[in-house]
Design a protein with these regions (language model features):
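Short, strongly hydrophobic transmembrane alpha-helices
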Residues: 1-15, 263-266
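Hydrophobic transmembrane alpha-helices
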Residues: 3, 34, 254-267
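Structured, solvent-exposed hinge/loop segments at the ends of secondary-structure elements
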Residues: 10-135, 155-160, 164-165, 218, ...
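Residue-level recognition of specific faces of alpha-helices
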Residues: 15, 247-250, 254, 267
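"Rare, low-scoring activations can occur
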Residues: 55-68, 134-135, 158-249
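Surface-exposed connector loops and short turns at secondary-structure junctions
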Residues: 137-145
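A glycine-biased structural micro-motif
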Residues: 147-151
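Intracellular coupling helices
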Residues: 265-276
Length: 276
């Protein structure tokens, strides 16, 4: 019985270690996140909001040498499922639709295996282009040739469906998993610079967190003294799955240690009995 417990505990620990070694397709280590909030009275239209965010990105890059990028959806949380439809009249498939700014893939450490990621001009104009995940490209066009093909996302709700514009595939993004047990996702990335009161941004920098946070606050206040920039947080701390997995690993390691001790006692007892 003790031996069975020992073997079972060892197998469980090995499974957890394997999961922790899963390649997520992006690098959360050293990546910081924060949120900007702007006062509506200072911004008469979406173009004014967009202007602030573009100036913020440009100023932070000039002051700190760090790239700031925006995303409509956070890491470690699977995005809402949309219907992703190809232009060949074929049936669409379920996948995620994420709006991101220029530099998103480089900052997150996501490989663009073919083509390129978005330019600043494309993100500002919300150009009709897209970066398609490898899994989505493979599912929509099994024979290959996703670059240059058209695709669109359709948001489906109880009230009906809302199709987005047709977009031309300009890049193929590497596989990304939002969690350690996630399947390879079929995601569609679209260019966009925030044009509203709120924006979640991400930054990777060589500067210590407190220094970087102070610099971001200063830049934001120089552009708009009413702008509110939340304190930075490390993206890897947002991973609730990893936190739970670490706890599970320690718990299983404890069980395995107990099982080892019991197994040794059992073997000692059997050996002592045989000698007598």
């Amino acid at each position: 019985g003790s031996l069975v417990l020992l073997v079972g505990g060892g197998l469980m620990v090995r499974s957890v270690v394997t999961m922790l070694n899963t390649d997520l397709g992006f690098d959360p280590a050293g990546l910081h996140a924060s949120r900007i909030m702007l006062r509506a009275r200072n911004y008469p239209d979406p173009a004014a909001y967009r202007s602030f965010h573009e100036r913020f990105v440009s100023s932070v890059s000039a002051v700190t040498g760090s790239q700031v990028v925006f995303s409509s959806w956070p890491p470690f949380v699977p995005p809402p499922e949309h219907l992703i439809e190809p232009d060949a009249g074929e049936a669409g498939i379920s996948g995620g639709a994420i709006s991101v700014s220029a530099g998103y893939f480089a900052t997150f450490g996501i490989t663009v295996t073919q083509g390129r990621e978005f330019s600043v001009e494309e993100a500002s104009a919300e150009a009709p282009v897209a970066v398609i995940s490898e899994t989505l490209a493979r599912r929509l066009w099994p024979a290959g040739g996703a670059l240059g093909r058209r695709v669109r996302d359709i948001a489906v709700t109880q009230g009906g469906s809302t199709p987005g514009p047709w977009r031309t595939g300009g890049g193929i993004g590497g596989e990304v998993r939002q969690t350690y047990d996630d399947r390879q996702r079929s995601d569609l990335y679209m260019p966009r610079t925030p044009d509203g009161r709120f924006g979640t941004f991400y930054v990777r920098s060589h500067l210590p967190g407190p220094v970087l946070s102070d610099q971001l606050q200063r830049v934001g206040e120089e552009i708009d003294r009413d702008a509110v920039i939340n304190p930075l947080r490390l993206v890897e701390h947002d991973d609730q799955t990893l936190a739970g997995t670490r706890f599970l690993t320690w718990m299983l390691a404890g069980f395995a240690a107990i099982a080892t001790f019991l197994a040794m006692l059992g073997i000692y007892g059997v050996t002592a009995y045989a000698v007598q």
